[in-house]
Design a protein with these regions (language model features):
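Short acidic active-site motifs
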Residues: 47, 63, 70, 151
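Short, ordered loop/turn segments at secondary-structure junctions
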Residues: 42-43, 64, 102-103
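ATP-dependent carboxylate-amine ligase
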Residues: 1-45, 53-59, 70-74, 92-95
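Conserved beta-strand-loop-alpha-helix hinge of the TIR/SEFIR fold
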Residues: 60-63, 82
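Generic non-transmembrane alpha-helix signal with a bias for helix starts/N-cap capping motifs
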Residues: 23, 45-46, 83, 126
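Phosphate-binding loop of NTP-binding sites
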Residues: 4-8, 29, 53, 67, ...
Length: 173
């Protein structure tokens, strides 16, 4: 049975590779929806580390399978090679996992979504479109791999009615 994003509260999710701009935005969106969020990566630097810390997300440097505490879902980033200890742990313990594109496709993209695609300017176009709609009185959901001058940075989830995305070549067909 498919879990609908807005029906699930107080779940646990772990991100392997949480420090990227897009993965951290996704982690922040789940946190704002009430999920317990944890993550790992090889390096943490401002402003991403600052946003994660301010949101109360537990994250740690390196790969430590023993710190993965029975999550309902593991999001596996591109940084997880076939020899990554956390990725091996997820497979060995048969934990529920998805890639970043799979999470976007399942939880965010709806039939009335708008995805800004192209070679250059996707993040800027998505942020500008989001700002225009907010100024016009709409409250769209959005997700993009960039840090903008918005209180929610690269992700905001309110309702499943409107969603804007900058896919960065990651949204499946």
């Amino acid at each position: 049975m498919r879990l609908e994003f807005f029906e699930v509260m107080a779940k646990k999710i772990h991100f392997i590779g949480i420090c990227g701009v897009a993965m951290s935005a996704l982690a922040l969106a789940f946190k704002r929806q009430g999920w317990k969020v944890t993550g790992s990566d090889v390096g943490f630097y401002p402003p991403v580390s600052t946003h994660l810390k301010e949101a109360g997300i537990d994250f740690y440097p390196g790969w430590h399978p023993e710190k993965i505490n029975k999550p309902d879902l593991v999001v596996v980033g591109n940084v997880a090679s076939s020899t990554n200890p956390e990725w091996l742990y997820v497979q060995e313990h048969k934990l529920n996992y998805k890639s970043y594109p799979e999470v976007i496709a399942e939880y965010f993209v709806k039939k009335n979504s708008i995805v800004c695609a192209g070679t250059y300017g996707k993040t800027t176009s998505t942020a500008l479109l989001t700002w225009i709609l907010k100024e016009a009185g709409f409250d769209p959901n959005y997700m993009f791999g960039g840090l903008m001058a918005m209180p929610t940075n690269g992700a905001y989830i309110n309702t499943p009615l409107q969603f804007f995305s900058s896919p960065s070549q990651t949204v499946p067909p």
